């Protein structure tokens, strides 16, 4: 049985349907990227998969060995969240809370899991630092480690590279790919980045006009009208930003980075 199966799924707000006729499956080991313009319903679908939004029609079915609370989630950060005054270790450990029941303290099992995930994401050297003092890329790694503490199966990522500079973005995409391929974690990611989606993902779900425009493999997607229309739109935005001087430029290398992670984030893809 598939990990997640959505059949004729629909969502509505105040009686107004915002998404309908969604039909797709997520298998173990998939890397699914959800694409679409702003307002296409991507975040609504994420809430539905997490059990935070009840469908107005259809059904979300989970495999026998998966429950909604076993899905790790990395949401987009708000300014308040970025200024959270806790240590990195405390933030990562909080990802274990959903599996602790009524137990009010972390045990050896949770601490070992947090240590493993911090090591896997190469942030062990940051464990005692305050979360709000970290760079944007470091904070995303911490939140990703937190999401992994909540699951060993599926993570949902809501635009995980939003606001990051180009070099840190490359490193983040590589890290997510490693989590998928080496750790065997199924990835479901919302993104506006068409090029990254078709490079790293195994499957694409394209939403638009309140419905599903495409679901299938990346190779199949490259031959659709939805792909070419969205790609042309991305190129137009890129040209406009470049002409207006609004594209982010890679930051100059820091001769004395505070940590090994900050130094690695500034490596240029060779």
PLM regions: where:
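Conserved ABC ATPase "signature" region
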Residues: 108-126
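Conserved ABC ATPase signature
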Residues: 130-134, 138
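Catalytic Walker B motif of ABC-type/P-loop ATPase nucleotide-binding domains
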Residues: 155-158
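Helix N-cap at the start of a conserved alpha-helix in ABC-type nucleotide-binding domains
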Residues: 166-168
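H-loop/switch region of ABC-family ATPase nucleotide-binding domains
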Residues: 191-192
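H-loop (His-switch) and adjacent beta-strand-loop-beta switch element
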Residues: 204-217
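ABC ATPase nucleotide-binding domains
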Residues: 219, 223-270
């Amino acid at each position: 049985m598939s990990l997640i199966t959505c059949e004729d799924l629909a969502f509505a707000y105040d009686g107004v349907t915002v998404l309908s006729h969604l039909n797709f499956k997520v298998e173990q080991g998939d890397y699914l990227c959800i694409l679409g313009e702003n307002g296409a319903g991507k975040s609504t679908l994420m809430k539905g998969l997490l059990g935070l939004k009840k469908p107005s029609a259809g059904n979300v079915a989970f495999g026998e060995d998966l429950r909604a609370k076993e899905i790790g989630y990395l949401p987009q950060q708000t300014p308040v969240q970025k200024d959270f005054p806790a240590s990195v270790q405390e933030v990562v450990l909080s990802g274990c809370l959903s599996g602790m029941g009524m137990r009010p303290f972390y045990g050896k099992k949770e601490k070992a899991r947090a240590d493993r995930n911090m090591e896997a994401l190469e942030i062990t050297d940051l464990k005692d630092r305050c979360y709000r003092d970290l760079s944007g890329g470091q904070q995303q790694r911490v939140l990703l480690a937190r999401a992994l503490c909540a699951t060993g199966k599926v993570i949902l990522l809501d635009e995980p590279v939003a606001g990051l500079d180009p070099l840190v973005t490359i490193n983040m995409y590589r890290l997510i790919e490693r989590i998928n391929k080496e750790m065997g974690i199924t990835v479901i990611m919302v993104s506006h980045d068409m090029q990254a989606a078709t490079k790293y993902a195994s499957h694409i779900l394209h939403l638009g006009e309140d419905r599903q425009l495409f679901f299938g493999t990346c190779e199949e997607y490259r031959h659709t009208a939805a792909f070419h229309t969205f790609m042309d739109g991305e190129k137009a935005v890129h040209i406009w930003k470049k002409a207006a001087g609004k594209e982010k430029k890679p930051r100059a290398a820091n001769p004395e980075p505070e940590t090994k992670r900050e130094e690695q984030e500034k490596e240029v893809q060779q």
